């Protein structure tokens, strides 16, 4: 039995297949790997089985196991015009800054823009069949942190959680940056909403003259409180009856 066959057989058993069912699946793939339906006689069958039939089957089982984890994507920088354009509604949105150093979190790491995309079969075999923690780490790093060099400008970091879906952030917010086209009403509303959090700073993005760079100027939240949109009277006074 080929090493990939053994790996696939092992994974099938882990997913609930009986030994007979797993063997039948292997024999079925062997049968379909040759043009003449004779795995023993057709020498090209083993190559086709190893390169074309087994890898997607193994990949399907591995992905099913690890795709249930959540990915929280972050960036090192707020200064990228491309990211403001792509991810912040063409500079109309906001950028939230987190402090990731206060709370230990072992699953946060920088994206590797030089790593190969494919996961090595030898690592899968060592992880699944030999319980190698180092091989498991390499598989996870490739799956979650490998990205094409073309994305290097994003300076991305990823925090991996045990489940997918919207959850509360582990990291405290330290600053909010408003895009250069962000509406004044949005800025006022957010500053008023978070102004009680004195540990949060606010910045407005502006273009640098004669270049494509961006700069951030601090916003004074007290000025926004005075000059910005005021709360309606019903929220300030509640059910109080005003004199006629």
Language model regions located:
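Partner-binding and oligomerization surfaces adjacent to conserved cores of proteins
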Residues: 1-244
